[in-house]
Amino acid sequence: MQTQLDFWLWNSIISKTDCQKIIDRGLEQLDILQKEGFDSNATTFGDNHKTGTRSISQKDLTQQQLSENNINEKDVYIRDSRIAWLSDQWIYDLIWPWVYKSNNRSGWHYEFDYAEPAQFTIYDKDQFYGWHSDGPNDIHAVKRRKIPGVYDETHTDKALFAYADGLIGKVRKLSITLMLSDPNNYEGGNLKFDRGEHIKNRYEEISGGMVNQGSIVVFPSYKYHCVTPVTKGTRYSLVVWFNGRPMK
């Protein structure tokens, strides 16, 4: 294990057999989505949508650069990957213990009680995820249940899925990435953190050469990060967000 300013890394703690089972399950779910007419290409909000066209690939542009270049954020694809959603209990059983250990040993000590559906992600050659934060706007805290005489209807937004009732009033506290691929099977696709311009060594990059198949990276959801373009092969990963009440 290794601790850093922005993340906690557990190397090779999920077996290769279990990694392959997750990959197989994710590919199965992708096949179902495609048969139902849904596009597996991830949008900025992370959902699956009916097949459409995309315009600009953001890659390494920041929000400030988008503004300075008068690029409409709605015309930009901040990510280029394929995704499917998994809610199998056995997957959570593999992951939860390591999230708890990371939270305690790192000193973060966040309170959380809810895990969102796991996002199985495929990055093929030249695919990427630009700079972003998983929980910058308390995306679930603004949601409200329908209460007769108080709220006429449940307040939601386009990012709300069927599972979101358990997320109402909560924020993302911790994010995890489980590396499902053998690092010998792809190049690039590094998980990269931006510590801020005030830090001497501003960027921290976790490359395939640093982690083995079955490694888990845990980090606070507000941390600014990206996945660099894959230059060779295919990178499989699993992402899960852990939620709790604000300010705890």
Description of each model-found segment:
Residues M1-V218, Y222-K248:
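Fe(II)/2-oxoglutarate oxygenase catalytic core
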